[in-house]
């Protein structure tokens, strides 16, 4: 887990550097590799803009990117799900090796790694999708904020370069952000307090960011989080996961009950 946090911290630091190093306008004359990627994304959005409707281009490109990243997302979600399923066993290991000395910690680490290996869980493999996804999504976000061509035009009631005057997109972005986090945490065996707090804090933050942001950016947040909700319901439906988990528990209880009944019958025959 510490390694996972370390790698996640490294990724966040790298993204902050990328963001800080590039805040000015991006044009066809930009030569920096990161800026070229941003401009390439912007060009695709313009290509997808039916009848010059940049809003449609933003929606289609967001859906396209999220769909292409779907296999990576699934790898990450499957790894997280396996980790959740192993929580009871991990707690048992922690109870077996409660010591804080170096030897006890090493024994706990080795036992944990053996458990991961036995169940096909790889911490490194679970981080790789994150390393690939985040820069792509950041480049898409910066295409909307740093390429002037994507800041102009109207879509429905929106002026894409200005905030939503009716707060419709900020509200939708916040609602879908909440639903996405809530659905992801719904099937967790053990509720993480930090994740629970973030489930309620993030939507509020997204709302205020979207209120101040250009409508093009708010549109991206809304579509991206709506896609995330649909994706979770289709591929990682928490209600289905909970039902399957309960079915396994019930089946095990029934199996144990049959064993006890068989043992009682055997004792009566004696």
UniProtKB/Swiss-Prot annotation:
How would you describe this protein's topology in the membrane?
Answer: Multi-pass membrane protein
Q: Does the keyword Ligase apply?
A: no
Which InterPro entries does its entry note?
YidC/ALB3/OXA1/COX18 (IPR001708), YidC/Oxa/ALB_C (IPR028055), YidC/YidC1/YidC2_Firmicutes (IPR023060), YidC_ALB_C (IPR047196)
GO biological process terms, semicolon-separated = protein insertion into membrane; protein transport
Question: Membrane-spanning residues where?
Answer: 44-64, 125-145, 163-183, 201-221
**Localization (cell):** Cell membrane
Principal cellular location given in the protein's record:
membrane
Lipid attachment site numbers (S-diacylglycerol cysteine): 21
Lipidated residue numbers (N-palmitoyl cysteine): 21
Query: Which cellular component terms (GO) are annotated to the entry?
Result: plasma membrane
Does the keyword Transcription feature in the UniProt annotation? no
Which Gene Ontology molecular function entries are recorded, alphabetically? membrane insertase activity
The UniProt keyword set, sorted, is: Cell membrane, Chaperone, Lipoprotein, Membrane, Palmitate, Protein transport, Signal, Transmembrane, Transmembrane helix, Transport
Q: Where is the signal peptide?
A: 1-20
Family, similarity comment: Belongs to the OXA1/ALB3/YidC family. Type 2 subfamily.
Q: What protein name is recorded for this chain?
A: Membrane protein insertase YidC
């Amino acid at each position: 887990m510490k390694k996972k946090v370390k790698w996640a911290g490294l990724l966040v630091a790298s993204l902050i550097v990328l963001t800080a190093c590039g805040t000015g306008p991006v044009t066809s004359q930009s030569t920096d590799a990161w800026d070229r990627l941003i401009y390439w994304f912007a060009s695709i959005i313009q290509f997808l803009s039916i009848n010059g409707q940049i809003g449609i281009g933003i929606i289609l490109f967001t859906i396209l990117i999220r769909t292409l990243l779907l296999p990576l997302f699934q790898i990450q979600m499957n790894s997280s799900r396996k980790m959740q399923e192993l929580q009871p066993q991990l707690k048992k290991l922690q109870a077996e090796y409660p010591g804080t000395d170096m030897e006890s910690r090493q024994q706990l680490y080795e036992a944990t790694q053996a458990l991961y290996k036995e169940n096909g869980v790889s911490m490194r493999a679970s981080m790789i999708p994150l390393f690939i996804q985040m820069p792509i999504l950041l480049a898409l976000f910066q295409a909307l904020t740093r390429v002037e061509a994507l800041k102009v035009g109207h879509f429905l009631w929106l002026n894409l370069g200005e905030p939503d005057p009716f707060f419709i997109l900020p509200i939708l972005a916040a609602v879908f952000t909440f639903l996405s986090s809530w659905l992801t945490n719904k099937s967790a065996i053990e509720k993480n307090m930090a994740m629970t707090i973030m489930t309620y804090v993030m939507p509020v933050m997204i709302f205020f960011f979207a209120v101040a942001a250009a409508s093009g950016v708010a549109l991206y947040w809304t579509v991206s989080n709506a896609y995330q909700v649909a994706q979770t319901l289709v591929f990682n439906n928490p209600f289905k996961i909970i039902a399957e988990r309960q079915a396994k528990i019930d089946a095990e209880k029934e199996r144990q009950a049959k064993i006890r009944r068989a043992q009682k019958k055997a004792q009566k025959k004696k």
